[in-house]
Regions:
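Alpha-helix/helix-capping structural signal
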Residues: 25, 69, 147-150
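C-terminal helix-cap and adjacent tail motif
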Residues: 19-27, 32-35, 166-192
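Short, Lys/Arg-enriched N-terminal segments with co-localized hydrophobic residues
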Residues: 2-14
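Small-aliphatic-rich amphipathic alpha-helix that forms the alpha element of a beta-alpha
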Residues: 48-49, 94, 100, 111-155
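Short amphipathic alpha-helical segments
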Residues: 41-46
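Glycine/small-residue-rich phosphate/adenosyl-binding loop
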Residues: 40, 53-123
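A glycine-rich helix N-cap at a beta->alpha junction
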Residues: 84-93, 157-179
Length: 192
């Protein structure tokens, strides 16, 4: 009896997670209503932290920009024009990773040919958790890779030991994008 209950609960959780994955959308237009709170941002970043990382190095870092003045400054000075509109009415999360840790030995020797690629990979895993948790809490996101990293570093006092990767806009959606077409799974997988 208990085994059956646990089995059904596990299946329900998995179904809810699958639905979350399938229903999440990239949001490029945000409502001025319902700004995200500091507590909600902390909840989202805690979820990001749960992602696996190389030797549990946990090198992802997050710089949350919530004041309207700072969002406007970052948008105008650090994002290309095409991304500035995507930041309107949103808060911003600048994502970085501490370089020369993930994929490296303690003495600084790379573990393999990817080197700092592992830090970026690990941050991608964290950012996936971040956008899924945001969606679960009712917030949309868009990950923007086009940004001026040096200017972000200057404005937000990001240390030179970190690599600036992306700016994530986060807020209440003002649009409902259709589900984009996905390739057939048979087209992207090979079995041997």
């Amino acid at each position: 009896m208990i085994t059956q209950i646990l089995h059904h609960q596990t299946r329900r959780i998995n179904m809810e997670f699958q639905k979350l994955i399938e229903e999440r959308r990239t949001i490029r237009k945000y409502s001025p209503e319902g700004k995200i709170t500091k507590d909600e941002l902390l909840t989202i970043i805690r979820a990001a932290q749960e992602a696996p990382s190389w030797k549990n190095s946990q090198t992802g870092r997050y710089y949350c920009v919530t004041s309207e003045d700072m969002v406007e400054k970052i948008s105008k000075e650090c994002l290309p024009e095409m991304n500035q509109a995507k930041a309107e009415n949103a808060s911003l999360i600048v994502t970085t990773f501490v370089h020369n840790h993930a994929g490296f030995q303690k003495d600084g020797t790379p573990d393999n040919e990817l080197g700092n690629g592992w830090g970026c990979y690990d941050l991608g895993l964290q950012n996936e958790n971040l956008v899924l948790k945001a969606w679960e809490l009712g917030y949309g996101t868009v990950i923007m890779g086009l940004r001026t990293g040096d200017k972000l570093r200057e404005i937000l006092s990001i240390p030179e030991t970190e690599t600036v990767v992306a700016v994530i806009a986060i807020g209440k959606a003002a649009e409902e994008p259709a589900r984009p077409k996905r390739k057939d799974v048979e087209d992207i997988v090979k079995f041997f």
